[in-house]
């Protein structure tokens, strides 16, 4: 049995401690991945700073995004995954309160339906940027209590509807743009002007400056949706309150699915009759979307070049010891990139 090492979070408010961790063999529906690269997300420094989740016990291991090699396969895992496969995966340690399922260690147990085999021409570094952003975008777009859009495919039928992706250059946004297009929807997005080229390159038909004053942005959005049918709004980053105010006005001017879902904390003063929800990637394990995206769609989409890993990976160091440097940088804010740590 291999030895395992992890970046332990002893308690909130202190740095990681690099220590031994048990190597855990997989349950019947899981695989074990030897991690080559892990990526960092804002939730990582939030959970280092404070116990935001009452169900998460400390000491623990954090981290959600991994790319690596399958080294052990559970007895009921389908033939889709086998020993030696190069994969990306969404780690579930935070949601399950099981350190063996977290990313920030050498070996991670992952539910097989949240594992995607990656093509040989895709590096572990680039693959590692995808899992959490992809999962959050997928839940927001396709979950029945969210926008409830049709699932993506390699040859989508046009729906004649248009999604608004707010903050399209964010980790969730870049995935939402591509998933929306793959599901047959047109995508209008907001972003900083410096990221217009990025979001248009991913397929957005229009990019609008979210830093514009509210009146200007409302008029631009109204013009962008003139004659179009709204499929809903996925708000991926930024202040939800100001975005809700603009979208409430927009909903009065357009036709379609007037529903707003966000990844961030909702304000208390939401207008009456404003349909909304908050999305969490953790629901992907139980709603059928995980298998549809990670198992069925993503492997061929990556292989055929129909889905691009984004945002851009930026290596902050090598080894588990570099994770603390990464979360410290992430606290200061990053734009249109994903901080990653190579473990090999």
What positions do the PLM features span?
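C-terminal hydrophobic helical "lid"/dimerization subdomain
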Residues: 286-344
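Cytochrome P450 core scaffold surrounding the K-helix E-X-X-R motif
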Residues: 42-49
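Eukaryotic N-terminal targeting leaders
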Residues: 1-17, 25-26, 49-51, 55, ...
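Glycine-rich beta-strand-centered segment in the early N-terminal region that forms part
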Residues: 22-39, 51-95, 101
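Mid-domain Rossmann-like dinucleotide-binding core that forms the NAD(H)/NADP(H) cofactor-binding site
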Residues: 131-212
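Glycine-rich cofactor phosphate-binding loops and adjacent beta1-alpha1 units
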Residues: 157, 206-287
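NAD(P)H dinucleotide-binding glycine-rich loop of Rossmann-like/cofactor-binding domains
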Residues: 91-163, 302
